[in-house]
Amino acid sequence: KVTSGTLRYMNGNNTAQNIIVYGNITIDNGAVFDVNTSGTAANMLTIHGNLTNNGTFDMNTGTGRVCNVIFSGPANREINGTGTVTDFNTIEVNKGSSRNAILEVKSSALSLNTSLATALNLTNGTFRLTSPLVLNLTNAGSFTIPTSGCLSANGGTINIGGASATNATDLILDGRLEILSGNINVGTPGTNLNNDIEYSSGGTPEIIVAGGNLFVNGQIRRVTTINTGSLSYTQSNESSTVTIAGRNASNVRSMFEILNTGSKFNMSGGRLIISESFDNPSYIDLYLAPDSSTVTGGTIIFGSTETPSGIAFNAVSSVPLYNVEIDATTNSKTVDLRIYPLTIKNNLVINGNSVFRANGLNITIGGSLINSNSTSGQ
């Protein structure tokens, strides 16, 4: 515990120091735990307990003057406190051997070194942002969630991809991505970068959206070089929104796809928006052919204000959907049904002058057909 004064990594003789704390670290109001601003060293701090900062915690005081922090141990722990400076160079979460142990951020402030390609590394356990902060995890680098890891937003905003992002700045999903509330952004809205969620052919890739917002500037898809890979997708809560912008997309994969043995598509609430289309019947924008599915609510929306004029979406679903809506904001859109007949458990809503084309496939609607387009019916 630092009650007053300064506890400092000195960088003496440019030599790194490694400290392991098996209990908690507490920094009181007015106290400081930092790295010296002279000398250069990549120090290390391993914490098995909680980090409570009510003063100043600064592990990145300049180029080469850093302390990288590892949170370890199999128990749930927190980063909390009211200090205005809780500054990390990098954080590694290595808690236990599964995703069960949680490192939860509840502090008033927290920042990472945004000049690095990737500043948060998940090895084992869950990293959860509960504080209403904006946290940038990567700049140019991709971010990997391993099989035994979970990235979770519970009130804060997590960004993957910064000013130096490229098409390769993706979220590589082997484990779990979870949004309870708050936001997770993969890529920056408005950029023409294919920043994807790429789920692997191994591991147990899973997306859970129980509130808040998930934005993906590219696609949610398999690896482009092999056909294996199965995703478990669960969306609930009417306030939740998933937006797939589909920018600069790879046409060897759909904008949003769930298929193969072990895959799941479960939806009981919220909105799933596909903004962009390949606009080509040879390429499918929505491809749902999961191994299992439970659908009791939610709305799949084709198009948004970002969709170019005259676009046609191509949709495939072997499982029932609850609500389907075709957007007409700014301009009209067209949706073409492909391969399978479709069951819509509740409503099909066609806004403005948009068009839904069944292309000879049967459609069963359990609720209402709301067609605002009086000039076209196909």
Model regions and ranges:
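Extracellular beta-sheet-rich ligand-binding/adhesion modules
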Residues: 1-378
